[in-house]
Swiss-Prot record:
One of its GO terms (biological process) is L-lyxose metabolic process. It is an enzyme of class 5 (isomerase). One of its GO terms (cellular component) is cytoplasm. Its cofactor is Mn(2+). It holds the Pfam family RhaA. Belongs to the rhamnose isomerase family. One of its GO terms (molecular function) is manganese ion binding. Pathway: Carbohydrate degradation; L-rhamnose degradation; glycerone phosphate from L-rhamnose: step 1/3. This is L-rhamnose isomerase.
């Protein structure tokens, strides 16, 4: 006797077959698309340097939900709990401040040995790792500048930090057999009117050239640069603007990172993918949810998340676009935040894979925009949820909202025992 989920799955296959959509092929392709989940949702971007300093760089984690991770083992345990509730392939994105060392380590002296536990853990769980230098929350970034700093000594420190980070990233890729994407984002900018914008950008250009000068095997490591419109305390001028980073990636052959919250509120990165990909070899996406500013709310299955997935799938860009998430909400259960956001990204990818894209494309090419719109809207009502639930069961993952019960149980037995 079939279960309701199995019965719905069989009906869904029949419905989609009527539109010439191979559901099995879609699920097979979904199994080839990893989503890189960010570690910093688990501890509000605190890291393990244990300096006691505040989060800086024009970003904020708001809320004080109990039970956040404060040690590497706690964070890994929380990640395992989240991963168990997310179907399909996954990666983990680490920042440099998540190193492990018995003694304090200067950021320009970090080395692969400080991340060996993460690599061993990733091997056990069949995960790829991605990386980021951490150019904020540090005394030498307190005045708002790092790689573009006018003081050569300060600038040198951050150049060395990014160079060390690249070697760690390459170590990840070498050990795990999948390239690590290392994204460089700097908070450099000014609160008020800036006279010599060119000098700051010339210094950033030169510094980045030094950072990426060491040749590294691209099967192990991929460089990316990320722009931003503004941050708290850098409202008037951001050195690494969109034009700067696009120009840098295009001229140096790096990947370009598009963060959903790093542009003007009326802009969306889904519209930028098909333009930027014409000029850069790869894109890194930071899928997020900006609410009036770069607030990094948990990703929803909303129009923009769906549009991002459509752009990747419609244009067959999976081999050139790396999908990562970037949000941190300290007002709700942090494990639930991971699960909600990552499942939503995967749901959006599944829906994109189930779209009758070739039919829609032919309608567009023939100028039949009436039929294009009608079909676009009607296919939203197709039974993709039945396919999703079947996919979850294939991966031994709870298909519906019942996963929250596991999170609540973990919260009661583990998170409530933590201090702070």
């Amino acid at each position: 006797m079939s279960t309701p989920i199995e019965a719905a799955w069989q009906l869904a296959k029949t419905r989609y077959a009527g539109l010439n959509i191979d559901v099995e092929a879609a699920l097979k392709q979904l199994d080839q698309i990893p989503v890189s989940m960010h570690c910093w949702q688990g501890d509000d971007v605190a890291g393990f340097e244990n300096t006691g300093g505040p989060l800086t760089g024009g970003i904020q984690a708001t809320g004080n939900y109990p039970g956040k991770a404060s040690t590497p083992d706690e964070l890994r345990a929380d990640l395992e709990q989240a991963f168990a509730l997310i179907p399909g392939p996954k990666r983990l994105n680490l920042h440099a401040i998540y190193l492990e060392s018995a003694q304090p380590v200067a950021r320009n002296e970090i080395a692969p040995e400080h991340f060996s536990n993460w690599v061993a853990w990733a091997k056990r769980h069949q995960l790829g790792l991605d990386f980021n230098p951490t150019c904020f929350s540090h005394p030498l970034s307190a005045d708002g500048f790092t790689l573009s700093h006018p003081d050569e000594k300060v600038r040198r420190f951050w150049i060395e930090h990014c160079q060390a980070s690249r070697r760690i990233s390459a170590y990840f890729g070498r050990e795990l057999g999948t390239p690590s994407v290392m994204n460089i984002w700097v908070p450099d900018g000014m609160k008020d009117l800036t006279i010599d914008r060119l000098a700051f950008r010339q210094r950033l250009l030169s510094a980045l050239d030094e950072v990426i000068a060491e040749p590294l095997d691209q099967t192990h490591h991929i460089d990316a640069v990320e722009s931003k419109l503004f941050g708290i305390g850098a409202e008037s001028f951001t050195v690494g603007s969109s034009e700067f980073c696009l120009g840098y990636a295009a001229s140096r052959g790096t990947a370009l990172c598009l963060d959903a919250g790093h542009f003007h509120p009326t802009e969306v990165i889904s519209d930028k993918i098909s333009s930027a990909i014409l000029y850069v070899p790869r894109l890194l996406l930071h899928v997020s949810r900006p609410v009036r500013w770069d607030s990094d709310h948990v990703v929803l299955l909303d129009d923009e998340t769906q549009a991002i997935a459509h752009e990747i799938i419609r244009h067959q860009l999976l081999n050139r676009v790396h999908i990562g998430l970037d949000f941190f909400d300290a007002s709700i259960n942090r494990i639930a935040a991971w699960v909600i956001g990552t499942r939503n990204m995967k749901k959006a990818l599944l829906r994109a894979l189930l779209e009758p894209t070739e039919t829609l494309r032919k309608l567009e090419q023939n100028g039949d925009y009436t039929a294009r719109l009608a079909l676009l809207e009607e296919q939203k009502s197709l039974p993709w949820q039945a396919v999703w639930e079947h996919y979850c069961q294939r991966h031994d993952v709870i298909p519906g909202s019942e996963w929250l019960q596991q999170v609540r149980q973990y919260e009661e037995t583990i998170l409530t025992q933590r201090q702070g």
